[in-house]
Amino acid sequence: LGEDFVCFGDCSLAAVVYRELRALDRTLAVAESCTGGLLGDAFTNVPGASKAFLGGVICYSNDVKVALLGVPDSLLEQHGAVSAECAIAMATGSAERLSADYGLSITGFAGPEGGNKDNPLGTIHIGYHSPVGVWCKTVRYTGGRLDVKARAVHAALDWMRRKIRKYKFEEFLNYSATD
């Protein structure tokens, strides 16, 4: 199954990400706009998660993105709140403001209103800040608002799981090469 394998038995993606973070002795902070706290909720459902999950910011308004996460006004004016640039700034801001190793963010148009030609309804930008760099993944979903929000959280968790496993594998290769 390779990287598509998550775990044996009954487990959540948040629990898998938590275990990966604990194995690395790393911490995570999140920033959420359109998901309104669902990503943080997924982590707080994992017993003992506070050992790796530090907390998050629900930043539905641009003012909160600026004030609490340090997203520049100029970035919001140039790219908008639903953009790859904003997602990365949110992830970085959450990690920096909460002193976490990793930051994960979600911003998008969950519907039924909003959207534009560049970012139609269902567009979700997931920001990822790590010790080795920053990235953004963009996904698009159809369906109702609650479905889009749930799928966005699932996508963010799965992407982070894959990124951490790739990082661990690369660290292993680097360590093995110096042995």
What spans do the regions from the language model cover?
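Short alpha-helical segments enriched in small residues
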Residues: 1-179
